[in-house]
Amino acid sequence: MRRVNKTCLLAALAFAGCAHEPAPPPAPPAAPVAFSQSGAAAEARWAEAFGDPALLDLLARARRGSPDLALARARQREAVALLRAADAGDEPALSLGAVQEASRISVANGRFPPGIPRRTDVTAVAAKASWELDVWGREAAKSQAAAADVRAAKFTADQADLALAAEVARLWFAVRGAREQLAFLETEFATRFREMELVERTVAAGLVDSDPLSSAKLAAAQAKVDEGLGRRRVAAAENALRALIGAAPGEPLPLARAPAAMPAFGAGVPSELLLRRPDLAAAAARLDAAVAREGAARADFYPSITLTGQAGWQADPASRIGQGAAGFWSLAPSVDLPLFDAGRREANLEAARARIDGSAAEWTKAVLGAFREVEDALADLRELAQQEELTARVLAAVRERLANAEARLRAGLANESEVTVARRDEALAARTLSLVVWERRQVAVRLAAATGGGWSSK
């Protein structure tokens, strides 16, 4: 026994200097010094900044019934269970077994001693233990990889929650904007229809020829087509929102009347973006897992050192177990050095290194994409803010012109056509402003999501 123990110890010492240390992950891409627009990034309760209670209700409903969130959380639980399994790989294994053996020696065996029964019955009960010493850090690397998988699964679930909230908010503002556009189109059709009826009466009275009637009918028909397109856009936006929150087809959605506020979201500091976005944290965790698994693959090249032993009782017959049965035990340290496996370990190591390269590339792509998403949202917000300000000034000027035209009409200084043109211009400006207002709020949601929505890994 001492000779075997000494041999195992010498083998362990011979390979002790070969233990693998996982390589550090590559550095992230260089972050820009600053984004094109300063300001604090959105906080965790960013949705409340819009001042829309209906939006908050929709978010709560979506989180309760989203299959994407349920899938992400199930994968998170799976990763936690796999971590427990990986941690158990470094612990001793203990089992309890029993055996009942009956044997009979043939009388044809001439060497069978006389006076000894040819049939024997043996019963044994034994506890067996085995423990593979993690000298080279293989099991530790597997545990590190599993722990990184848990972090990646948690961050992925957080990203799913953020993406769901952003999409619900975006679709809700799209619904509100489409409803406003439909209201404008319905008003336009009603106006065109009244104008057509007025022209019909004028033509019937013989005051004008039929040419204006053809133009009026064409304008009314086009307004009806536009109204139908508006209804389709409302239906499409509402159906998309229903699917996201788990509502049944045709189920009524909230009828919000209060205007949604425009939050002053910023982008924060670029260097902090890596810590604020759960998808970037998940990509970094997957890279950590790949590095740890490369360490486990390298450890497969080194010998495994295992301690096995058993202890128990043996009796003949079985009734003597515990009543004078003979005890036995054994302890067997062993060293297993792999020599030839047709290139399996080399292939596994090469695959592990390729996974590191792939994970690093995905991480770099995610970081660069995050910077681009923030800058795109900032650029869109700047442009939409200018458009909203300009369109609001145009609408104010058109309304002033309409008021003046109506005053002149009452004073007999203008005709009805001047007022009609001013009303059409006012409706067009109001419709354009509505488009810009709701698109700007959708882009604000995009910026909140691009900057992490106030997420923290803590």
Indicate where each model-derived feature is located.
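Periplasmic alpha-helical coiled-coil/stalk elements that build and connect Gram-negative outer-membrane
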Residues: 139, 148, 155-269, 380, ...
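Glycine-rich cofactor-pocket loops
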Residues: 208-212, 368-379, 414-417
